[in-house]
UniProtKB/Swiss-Prot annotation:
It is an enzyme of class 6 (ligase). IMP binds at residues 13-16, 38-41, 128, 142, 223, 238, 302. It is found in: Cytoplasm. Belongs to the adenylosuccinate synthetase family. The active site is at 13 (proton acceptor), 41 (proton donor). It holds the Pfam family Adenylsucc_synt. Binds 1 Mg(2+) ion per subunit. This is Adenylosuccinate synthetase. CDD domains: AdSS. Its cofactor is Mg(2+). One of its GO terms (molecular function) is adenylosuccinate synthase activity. The gene is purA. GO terms for biological process: 'de novo' AMP biosynthetic process; IMP metabolic process.
């Protein structure tokens, strides 16, 4: 049995899609365990770029099973569109499996997401407005509609009617807007359910059988540890658990079956949306990193906020996710910057803090303590091993590994999968 979990160690957008795609080559099953179509990943396959939001990136390999786990929230309309997009490009989806226990995002979730964000005004979270939060709210309130319900015409009709009664009262009395009629949603979404029915099963059985048979299973996290609802910068977080522990709940696989946890980080830090960001840059260097690194959201197109690498953040991610391997991406983006900085700790009211604080009030007053390192000017995009890196680039990479306490297993010097280099196998 060999299982690997891929998690983001920062605020998402660390390049997990590319690393998952790279590791998928040696995996037999690839599964997502949380989130929904709020997560976007770009995959380059046969020289062509694909953008996926729901379906695991292993779908491009005909011999691999791809799983949408029970911990995900699925927008059936978005899923059917993504399936069509893949079919139009000649990509088979026969090996897709969708959990019958995953929850469904419906039009009222999308509407609520947008209205609630507007209502918050200056206190908005920076949601992608994909209905993720409201769908997880219904799940926690035990009124959610699951995939298994969507496939049963009578059950779906009854649950939808009950939910619309409550949601329409909310729309009309609280937000002062028109609600939905049953017929606005029912037939369209029931039909989406029928279109995906052939993929639906108990995915926990699929995954556990694969592990028991000794197959290599790769679990693909979305977002990042700092967006985890428990361990992230709450409330500026997602509504699920991207941490590695989320696999046990969101995929139905016991904790004893997780062997390796790969933490993916950029050689700098980015964040989309609102919330604290201690090492954020508001200068020419920040603008340069954003442009060279093409730091714009896959899902939203929004420019990402950019900052120096923060080892306090990644150490926190290591601890709460049990990270065993570091995958460091986008090292090439820093080429040409004369002096690089790594945050090693925070200073709060004269005191040095080495662990990430829970209080956003404290965090807002924290000043990053930086270690400066010399940059490099050499082109590193063709580098294939640590030994080939210029001395300063290698020192920078190794210093990040030292400061975070995570052994380096993979490093990347460009967006293409051929620019991804293995230092040690994560399947060992």
């Amino acid at each position: 049995m060999s299982s690997v979990v891929v998690v983001g160690t920062q605020w998402g957008d660390e390049g997990k899609g590319k690393i998952t795609d790279f590791l998928s080559e040696n995996a037999e099953v690839i599964a997502r365990y949380q989130g929904g179509n709020n997560a976007g990943h770009t995959i380059v396959f046969n020289g062509e770029k694909y953008k996926l939001h729901l379906i695991p990136s292993g779908i491009f390999y005909k011999d691999k099973i791809c799983v949408i786990g029970n911990g995900m929230v699925v927008d059936p309309k978005a899923l059917v569109a993504e399936l069509s997009y893949l079919h139009e490009h000649g990509i088979s989806t026969d090996n897709l499996r969708i959990s019958n226990r995953a929850h469904v995002i419906l039009p009222y979730h999308l509407k609520l997401d947008g209205l609630e964000e507007e209502r918050k005004g200056a206190n908005k979270i920076g949601t992608t407005k994909k209905g993720i939060g409201p769908a997880y709210m219904d799940k926690a309130a035990r009124i959610g509609i699951r995939i298994v319900d969507l496939l049963d015409r009578d059950v779906f009709a009854e649950k939808l009617a009950r939910n619309l009664e409550e949601k329409n009262m909310l729309f009309e009395k609280v937000y002062g807007v028109e609600g939905f009629r049953h017929e606005d949603i029912f037939e369209e979404y029931y039909e989406y359910g029928q279109q995906i029915a052939k993929y639906v099963c108990d995915t926990s059985v699929v995954l556990n059988n694969a592990l028991d048979e000794g197959r290599r299973v790769l679990f693909e996290g979305a977002q990042g540890v700092m967006l985890d609802i428990d361990q992230g910068t709450y409330p500026f977080v997602t509504s699920s658990n991207p941490v590695a522990g989320g696999v046990t709940i969101g995929a139905g696989v016991g904790p004893t079956k997780i062997k390796h946890v790969v933490g993916v980080a950029k050689a700098y830090t980015t964040r989309v949306g609102d919330g604290p960001f201690p090492t954020e840059l508001h200068d020419e260097i920040g603008d340069r990193i954003r442009e060279v690194g093409r730091e714009y959201g896959t899902t939203t197109g929004r420019p990402r906020r950019v900052g120096w690498f923060d080892s306090v953040v990644v150490r926190h991610a290591r601890r709460v996710s049990g990270i065993t391997d570091l995958s460091l991406n986008s090292i090439d983006v820093l080429t040409g910057i004369e002096t690089l900085k790594i945050c090693v700790a925070y200073r709060y009211r004269g005191e040095v803090i080495e662990e990430f604080p829970a209080s956003l009030k404290v965090l807002a007053e924290c000043e990053p303590i930086y270690e400066e390192l010399p940059g490099w000017t050499e082109d590193i995009t063709g580098v294939r091993s640590l030994d080939e890196l210029p001395a300063n680039a290698r020192h920078y990479v190794e210093r990040i590994s030292q400061l975070t306490g995570i052994p380096l297993s993979i490093f990347s010097v460009g967006p293409d999968r051929s620019q991804t280099n293995v230092v040690r196998s994560v399947y060992a």
